[in-house]
Amino acid sequence: MAPTNLTKKPSQYKQSSRKGKKAWRKNIDLSDVEQYMEKKIDHEITHGTSDITSLQNDALFHVDVEGDEILKNKLIKRKQIKKVLKSKEILDAVKTNSKIAALNHHKNSSGNPNKIQGVSKHELKKLMALAGRVHGESKIKNRVAKDGLVKTTAGDLWGEESNSKKQKVKLPSGIKLDVEKKDQIPEELLKKSTTSWSTASVRPSTLDIEPIAVKEFTEIPHAGKSYNPNNKAWSELINKEYKEEKAREDERIALEKYKERIRHLMETLDDNEEEESSSNEEEEEEEEENENENESTQCSGSDKEIKLSINKPVKNKKKTKYQRNKAKRHEEKVKLQQELKELRQRVKDLEEVINSEETEILSAIESDSNKVKKSKKNKKHKLGTKYSVIDERLEIKFSDELSDSLRKLKPEGNLLYDTVRKLQSSGKVETRVPVRKGRKYKQKITEKWTHKDFK
């Protein structure tokens, strides 16, 4: 039963009480309570109980099977669904509502005594004979009768002929030839290659040798390089990178100082030094002779005086400016020669170490030729060229550069750079540096004399 639509009282103007507590109690608004009570009465009329939560779903809802007729007619007009004819509706109603079974055609009837599951007995006997289920009949004979097989030698139609008069010969270069059996093939053709190449017959020993580990390469980056790193890992990375960069900077500064020193020596030590020194020496000798003459005159005058000692008096002979400069230059020359000597000795020691390492490697290869070699570490980080493996880039962020969210994150590193460094470190690729092609000959500047034609 549908809920009854109760007409509500017309709403009146609500004025706040002007009297007191009694008037307020008298004029209180009870519209919400009245609505709730009316709803309860409606539920009691429609569902038989005021509390509908205790009822099952079947009592509250029902499924509409028929559908909306108005909507159906609209869809038929738009040709979105087909219109069901009245005759078909009557026949469908008879089919569903009639208690008498429909008539079956003799062709569709399954109660044929000569057929088993729709297969005739004659056809079934043939199938049983092919399967070898009939007593007294051969399975092979039935198969031959059906397929028409003939007993012959088994042979692959697309394969090689078994009774062929030709044989295949493989040359050292890998070329295959069809040669008749009666023909004799020369041994030179079988042993020596007729082309500029030949197929490998022996397994190369280099397959057992691992590539040389030129430089250590870490696959997983340091934890301090994360976009949100741990404080301990980040400080470790900062200290590590600082030490490496400081060592490089100290080496660079020392090299610059050494170059500046050599340049200064080359500027101060001129080629005309010997000529200048000889002229200065002559001047100094003349000065010394004059001093000796003065001393002799003084001595002759002082012979008359009384002497306490037989020996000549000791005099502090002061060096001239030229002598001091000469001694200073000599000291610098000696020091430079000593440094060059030490450098030569160091280079010689390095060459001896390299030669000894090479001899050790050769002896190890000869002794353990069949064993798999371990990866050798190269101390100089060089392979095949004079250039060492490219260094790892400085990929570190300071405390103010660290981002607290992925939106502010800036990508670091270069995948191509890391791949090349990995290939160079593992010894698979040699280190190369782009070099500009120089001039074959020096440019010659000449003055043209064409301006004389206008005079």
Swiss-Prot record:
The keyword Zinc does not apply. Residues 1-15 have a biased composition (Polar residues). GO terms for molecular function: 5S rRNA binding; rRNA binding. GO terms for cellular component: nuclear exosome (RNase complex); nucleolus; nucleoplasm; nucleus. Keywords: Nucleus, Phosphoprotein, Ribosome biogenesis, RNA-binding, rRNA processing. Disruption phenotype: Inhibition of cell growth. Defects in processing of the rRNA components of the 60S ribosomal subunit and accumulation of the corresponding polyadenylated pre-rRNAs. Some delay in the maturation of the 35S primary transcript and 32S pre-rRNA. Delay in 20S pre-rRNA formation and a severe delay in mature 25S and 5.8S rRNA formation, with accumulation of the 35S, 32S, 27S, 26S and 7S pre-rRNAs and a 5' extended form of the 25S rRNA. Complete loss of synthesis of the mature 25S rRNA. Appearance at a low level of aberrant 23S species. Shorter 18S and 5.8S rRNA at the 5' end. Its main location: nucleus. Residues 1-25, 264-333 are annotated as: Disordered. This is Ribosome biogenesis protein NOP53. It comes from Saccharomyces cerevisiae (strain ATCC 204508 / S288c) (Baker's yeast). The gene is NOP53.
